[in-house]
Amino acid sequence: MADLLRDDIGLTGTKIGCSIGVCGACSILVDGTLMSGCLLPAIMVDGRSVTTIEGIAPSESELSPLQDAFIKKGGFQCGICTSGQIIAATALLAQNAKPTREEIKEWMMGNLCRCTGYYKIIDSIEAAAGIDRANV
């Protein structure tokens, strides 16, 4: 699915990192469920709703709360993992609007990042969820 999205449809926000479903760079939502795009045959999404990083913002001139929080909190550096991180976090917040820090860590374990050390990613997710740890 990731190759189809990138090469045939031109949605290049979905990255291909490991091609074995381990890194999370290819994360997409299928009917709202988080999936690894690199492992998913395109035929399996026929007739289903597929959301990539390009589809989570309310409009082309606005960012989603997660995209905005990642920018404000510095939740990315090189950017290879960013779309997968944001898609995974979108799925998390759809299921759990106010996750604990431990719940965020557990949920995001399938998304690898070699740059940030994860703290700023977690801070970004908390900010998007409206969680202020200084007051918790």
PLM features per residue range, with description:
Residues 2-136:
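Signature of N-terminal electron-transfer/Fe-S-associated modules in redox systems
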